[in-house]
Curated annotation (Swiss-Prot):
Homology family: Belongs to the UPF0128 family.
NCBIfam families: TIGR00703 family protein
HAMAP family per the UniProt record, alphabetical: UPF0128
Source domain of life: Archaea
InterPro entries: UPF0128 (IPR005266)
Protein name in UniProt: UPF0128 protein PF1488
Length: 222
């Protein structure tokens, strides 16, 4: 993609951490419990439907007891997450902050959780076109099946320009950061021929509503 491309770039700051809702945690595949760990009051998670209220179990040498499975994030608490890179591998760390107390919840491979979320939400564009996941995530899509050269922006049809406006709005209003590189080769047999490379902050993709919006934009020219 060295020539004839259109670029939309917002060189903002990739967020170091982000707040999430219960609907996001559910989409990641987790239940949030209030109970005890080794007799001490704590919040912790288990896979959706795996544990029940009143259950006591052992995990990695510690005893857990579930008093209550939360339906919402407690009013005085915040669910936060961040991406860390260790030995060349990304991890999603998420925790609950309740006033001055921090309850670590899990540290998982973000690729596994994103796949779980995207499959649950049937976000096939994201599943098909993701290329790399780290602090940022790269998507690449190529639908070019003709021998041609990229067209200048002035020759883009209205539908293509509408997609570019959507991307600008996402970068400006939601992400604050993003890089979208686009080549358009024209339309043949009612099929748009184009290539795109889209880089976005990974944390935002764990938000159910944002993930749905990105998936929608990736499929607008299909």
């Amino acid at each position: 993609m060295l020539e004839g491309y259109y670029i939309i770039e917002n060189p903002g700051v990739v967020p170091s951490e982000r707040r999430f809702r219960m609907k996001d945690l559910k989409a990641w595949g987790y239940d949030l419990h209030l109970g005890t760990i080794e007799g001490e009051r704590a919040y912790f998670v288990s896979r959706t439907g795996e544990r029940e209220e009143g259950e006591t179990y052992s995990l990695q040498g510690k005893t857990y007891h579930i008093e209550k499975t939360e339906k919402e994030i407690p009013e005085n608490a915040r669910l936060l997450a961040r991406i860390v890179i260790e030995r060349g591998q990304p991890y999603l760390e998420f925790w609950l902050e309740e006033e001055d107390t921090v309850y670590p919840l899990a540290k998982e491979d973000p690729r596994i959780i994103l796949k779980r979320l995207w499959e649950k939400e049937k976000l096939n564009q994201l599943l098909k076109h993701v290329r790399a996941v780290g602090l940022t995530t790269d998507f690449y899509k190529d639908t070019v099946f003709i021998k041609s050269i990229p067209l200048p922006y002035e020759e883009y049809p209205p539908k293509v320009r509408r997609v570019l406006r959507e991307v600008r709005d996402i970068h400006r209003d939601i992400m604050g950061f993003g890089r979208f590189v686009f080549q358009y080769f024209g339309e043949e047999n009612k099929t748009h021929n184009y290539r795109l490379h889209w880089t976005l902050p990974t944390l935002h993709l764990f938000d159910v509503e944002i993930a749905n919006e990105i998936d929608k934009v990736l499929g607008m020219l299909d």
